[in-house]
Amino acid sequence: MIFLASRDRYTQRTLLRDVHDRLRKQAGCEDVRYRPSHRRPRYVVADVDPPVFLGDSSDAETARLEIRFWYPVNVDHEYYRLNWVEPDRNFVLGFHRDADHQALGPCHIQLDHEDTATDRYSATFLDEHPLAVLDDRLQQLPTALESVRWTDGTPSLPTCPI
């Protein structure tokens, strides 16, 4: 069992259960599930109805959220990845707090698309409880998605929106 530091015996399993429950209540989120399984959860996935989730029209017909929180050894805080995935366009936009890309600071926003170069920018660091981070990032996601520019079917993130 993994306990998250400074989180009053908050386990990774408990955290993912709370993320799952939070997404089940989120407008536009459907078929919320654990991956790889309920017995061994590592992240939470939800299919998304983009216009309902974003509150306006969206070019995406389908999307999903992939959310992972974990607590690595020898680190005194949680890592996370909150990714918006549009499989039909091979597009991923996510907020990450992990050991990758240290030059960008503790958090970054990342855009991935097929074989194009990945866009990354430093993002606002949130030193909060993981569920507060989840809520804040979910609120920031529509603004981040609006900042993406599409040219001839290729997305770019010209500046950091958050």
Where are these regions (language model features)?
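Well-ordered alpha/beta subsegment
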Residues: 117-154
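Solvent-exposed, non-transmembrane amphipathic alpha-helical segments
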Residues: 36-39, 87, 102, 115, ...
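Negatively charged, low-complexity tracts enriched in Asp/Glu with abundant Ser/Thr
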Residues: 1-68, 73-77, 158-161
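An exposed acidic His-Trp-rich patch
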Residues: 78-131
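Acidic, Ser/Thr/Gly/Pro-rich low-complexity intrinsically disordered regions
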Residues: 1-10, 18, 57-66, 95-102, ...
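Hydrophobic transmembrane alpha-helix bundles
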Residues: 69-82, 133-139
